[in-house]
């Protein structure tokens, strides 16, 4: 009887164990985490966005570098001496230090002997520069380029004798262009003057008196423009013009017409047809 019970208990235990084994649910394996995939996707998106931003910046820079120049024609028809409202200017003091007969030499030879030079580019006398711009005459048009970028900002057309599309006879400051219109020959009405022109608003600000300019260049000294005029059987002068108004504020009589002017160390080196002048200014 005892043996039978033992066998029954063993059989019952085995049955229970067997049933328990069959009843266990199979735990499905968890899918691999997608966290890594999401991180990779995020990095890829950031990389793509950065690349797109860089491309956009390059495209914007290219657009900025290829700005189209502004073409302006300045017409002086019917325009007489005109002055603008502006600050008055005290004339520079000047004193002739030397006056020498030059034997009718070339200006560049004298300047070279004095270790001086005009801000010319090349040897064709049609291109020159200042601290901000390069000016280039091509035919009867003046091209103004920005230093650094090389962008052509303006192309200006205005009447002046071809002989005078040489030398550094243009100046751009704060959007105002300073230039000159010259007719070669004896004095004529409405000729040989300097002018100031607002390039943004395309407006003439002032026009100096007739026969106040036929030198090949002018010098800028703060608010004073120094230039010259003269011709056969006419008085020959250096002029000081108020850059704000266009008014002549002083003049200095010379023996011959001033054609080129160089400033260095507080002195003007003025070349004329047959005389060289050194003039102190302060």
Regions found by a protein language model. Give the residues of each.
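Aromatic (tryptophan-biased) beta-strands that constitute blades/sheets of beta-rich domains
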Residues: 65-120, 151-163, 203-210, 237, ...
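Repeated scaffold domains used in trafficking and secretory/extracellular systems
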Residues: 80-82, 115-129, 160-173, 210-222, ...
